[in-house]
Regions:
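A gly/proline- and charged-residue-enriched helix-loop-helix capping module
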Residues: 124-128
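N-terminal secretory/targeting leader peptides
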Residues: 2-122, 132, 141-334
Length: 334
């Protein structure tokens, strides 16, 4: 019960003593669930949206239906940047946003966007599900956000119009990247030229030879049809950038006032829904890769010697994070 509800009840007490029948509306009001909003910018059938629904179901179960979470998918409540701002002021209760958006507010989070940071997905989850991941989530407190759990957003690789088998073949190519200084710096470090192209126009840019290639994960490569115009896939797996499930501080306070156990219930539900999202994403990613290989896409996988060349090429980017070298070492030794 919130302080406001308690004051209302105390104020109404004398009247209730005289007319007992007046107690019924108050009792009914207490039984109404707390309605909360979850913002998701992906469509309903996307892994993150399905995980959001799983989170909502878990919350209802674990709170005995005292808390109901409504999921708004398809960016119905706004784009990610807008959602972050709404959460900071309590306008949205929960969401899932990309790490790159959060790094705009907290530069230290950019460490997690460094290329070739992890050897594989298992290492990334050891880091993020451990004490290091908790440290990064705690950084969000200073942004008036509460970090709940880590979602998977896949691993990104290059794909091109002409065959690329290693670092030498990338030299001088024009590669479309996200609007991110980190991504542009990576392309330059690898000897190519970064290009900013609206995502929906990448297919046309590849088709018209305005760019030589792009980079993304397997599902996006398949869904956007980029394999039709860039059939050479260089599986270098340069970045594994997670996404974050968030709560607003205001809603966590509201939940604590309703029941002191509810904030931890929310955190537990978030962790469970994150596992659901990762499983859904892994299946989606594996299916997309399998489909592409069946279509005859030329896939080049790097041997250890060539991987070492790629890592050496981006070392200047790591040098810029010398102040966080100890943290980087902890990540790479996990």
């Amino acid at each position: 019960m919130t302080r406001r509800q308690l004051l209302r009840l105390l104020t109404a007490a004398p009247a209730l003593a005289v007319t007992g029948c007046a107690a019924q509306p108050a009792s009914s009001q207490q039984e109404k669930p707390l309605i909360l909003r979850y913002a998701e910018n992906q469509p309903e059938d996307y892994p993150t949206s399905k995980a959001a629904k799983a989170f909502a179901e878990l919350v209802a179960q674990r709170t005995n239906n005292k808390v109901k979470v409504l999921v708004y998918s398809g960016a119905e409540l706004g784009a990610e940047q807008s959602i972050i701002q709404q959460m900071q002021f309590g306008g949205v209760d929960f969401s899932r946003v990309s790490l790159s958006q959060l790094a705009e507010y907290e530069p230290e989070l950019s460490v997690l966007q460094l290329p070739y940071l992890y050897s594989d997905a298992q290492q990334m989850w050891r880091v993020l599900d451990g004490s290091i991941g908790d440290e990064f989530l705690a950084m969000l407190d200073g942004m008036d956000l509460v970090g709940l759990s880590w979602f998977d957003a896949g691993v990104r690789s290059f794909y091109t119009r002409e065959k690329v088998t290693g670092l030498d073949d990338l030299q001088g190519l024009t590669i479309r990247v996200q609007e991110s200084d980190m991504m542009s710096d990576m392309i330059i470090a690898l000897g190519a030229k970064p290009a900013q192209v609206v995502y929906s126009k990448v297919y046309a840019a590849l088709h018209n030879a305005e760019i030589d290639g792009a980079e993304n994960n397997w599902p996006s490569y398949e869904v956007m049809g980029h394999y039709e115009v860039a059939p050479f896939f260089l599986k270098d797996e340069h970045t594994r950038v997670p996404e974050v499930q968030l709560a607003s501080p205001a809603v966590m306070e509201k939940l604590a006032a309703l029941d002191e156990s509810f904030p931890e219930v929310i955190r537990a539900c978030a962790r469970e829904s994150a596992q659901t999202e990762r499983e859904l994403w892994a299946r989606r990613e594996a299916n997309a890769e399998q489909n592409m290989r069946k279509r005859g896409i030329c896939v080049t996988e790097l041997d250890e010697a060539e991987k070492a060349r790629f890592r050496a090429a981006v070392q200047p980017m790591y040098d810029e994070f010398s102040a966080q070298q100890e943290l980087i070492d902890r990540i790479q030794k996990s």
